[in-house]
Each structure stands twice: as C-alpha cells, then as structure tokens.
Amino acid sequence: MRVLFAGTPAVAVPSLDALVKAGFDVVAVLTRPDAPVGRKRVLTPSPVAARAMELGIDVIRAARVDADTTAGIAKYAPDVAAIVAYGGIVPKAALGVPTHGWVNLHFSLLPAWRGAAPVQRSIIAGDDVTGAATFQLEEGLDTGPVFGTLTETVRPEDTAGDLLERLSISGAVLLSQTLSAIDAGQAAPQPQIGEVSHAPKLTLDDGRLDWQQPALALNRRARGVTPEPGAWTTLDGQRVKLEPVALRPEVKDLPPGSIRVDGKSVLVGTGSHAVELGRVQPAGKKMMPPADWARGLATPERVVFE
C-alpha cells in the first residue's frame, strides 16, 4: 500500500519508522518547512524531514496544504495518508486525494482533548489515564470516526515530554496496525462516543504559576507545560523559569509565593501547602539547582514570588 506520511516534530518520527519497518511503501513525506533553530537561527529540517532524508524518502515541505501542495501530493498517488502532528489543517480538497483518505494518530482518547495540546491539557487537568487514537480525518477538528485506541497511565511525575515520548512509541504501533487493517479491508471505524473536551495550543501565559492556587494544581500545571512553553513565575518584575515542582504536604505555614530554604531544598507556599522547587532559571542565566539560586538572594526569607 502506497502511503503518504505527514508529520513534523520528533514525536512523529517513531510512526514513520514503524510504517517503514512494517513494509509499507512510504512514497513521500509532507512536513513543515525548515525552521531557524538555536541562537544563531540556523535553518534546520524538521525531525521528520531529517529522518525521511536518511531513509531516502521524498520530502514535500509546506507550511499549509494549499492547491499546489495538494497537487504535489496527488502526483504520488497515495492509497492512504497517515498524519501525526503535521502542524497544519488538511482542507477538503486534499482529504479526497488518497484512496482511503487520511488517518490521524491523535494523542488522546477521543473525543477527549480534541486539539493541538491533548497531552499537556490532560496532565494539567489531572487525568489518571490518557491514551491515543487513530481516526479518519475529516473537515471537523478531530471529529472523525475512530479506528483504534490504546490507553496509557499518567504517572505522578510525568511531564508532557515524558508522556508524549511513551505515546509516540505505542501510538506508532497502533498506527501501523490501523493501516494494516485498512489494507486488508478489515477496518471498521466507529463514531466518537463520550464527553467532548478541547485542548487548544498552549501559550506562554499557560505556564505562569499562580501561587494562590492549590499545590496539586501547580504541580500538574508545571508538569503539563514542560518542556514547552515551560513553567515560570516573576520576582521583582523579572521572569523566573521553573522546572516541575514537588509536593510537600507537611509544610502548611508558608504564605503563597513566600520561599523557605530547607537545606538543599527551596520551598514555596501555595494556596494549600508548600511545594519544593526543581531547578530554577533566573532572567539572563542558566538553569541551576534551587539551593544555588537561593544563595544568590540577599534575604531569601523576604522573597515573595509574584
């Protein structure tokens, strides 16, 4: 079966590898254009483009699936298109190009968390279980009938990066199985059933920690926005980046935002009980252990995060 693969970030690479390993004829890859990376802003291929070039697969670079891109896809006469985090909308004109349409691997148990940031929103919401689904792409946002699903436990220490990494590997197997079923004429997609929730793309402001909130909510938020866009707070009007924070339920006497140095640990008060800081990155500096950061403060006991 001739497959067009559409994807851009590193989490899509395991799916591309799985399809190649399973023996599918991946005729081309659709990915976002090369983007500037690092301080020197060097134009760099997407992780999917880089892997496709290693595998000798043709690469179509497009910021959007317009008429020209659709025509380029049609030249490859794909039987099916598999899409994993491509980063753009597939319009109606392109949906009908592959014989069997487009199959999307989405990192949630649809219809939960439709949208661009399902894993991040799931962690922030405090879900105990999430998963992945393959579904038939249609004009609505993640609304198409589902081919298959898998479940994944959300561990107490999981960041969005951790959970996405696991789902990218197990999801790759699910995607390969789905395409095999389609190829064998055995696929039977079912309408989505259940409560709908939405997962819009995270903004920088989603990473800001409000110390008036309960500790558990802050722990979940910090994990959900790690590695991107990252958790942060402010001190004297300057942004301070934070790695995920740990719960310290035995410490209940710290006012929200106030800090306390406890040996090598730095505690911060919240709306419920204290949390323990992970690494800290003050403005203009590198990430550092919290105790090192606290040693640079003139009067730590007077510091209050804003």
Swiss-Prot record:
Gene Ontology, cellular component aspect: cytosol
UniProt keywords, alphabetically: Protein biosynthesis, Transferase
GO molecular function, one term: methionyl-tRNA formyltransferase activity
EC number: 2.1.2.9
Enzyme class: transferase
Residues bound to (6S)-5,6,7,8-tetrahydrofolate: S108, L109, L110, P111
A family per Pfam: Formyl_trans_C
Catalytic activity: L-methionyl-tRNA(fMet) + (6R)-10-formyltetrahydrofolate = N-formyl-L-methionyl-tRNA(fMet) + (6S)-5,6,7,8-tetrahydrofolate + H(+)
HAMAP family: Formyl_trans (MF_00182)
Sequence similarity: Belongs to the Fmt family.
Job of this protein: Attaches a formyl group to the free amino group of methionyl-tRNA(fMet). The formyl group appears to play a dual role in the initiator identity of N-formylmethionyl-tRNA by promoting its recognition by IF2 and preventing the misappropriation of this tRNA by the elongation apparatus.
Database matches in NCBIfam families: fmt
Name of the molecule in the record: Methionyl-tRNA formyltransferase
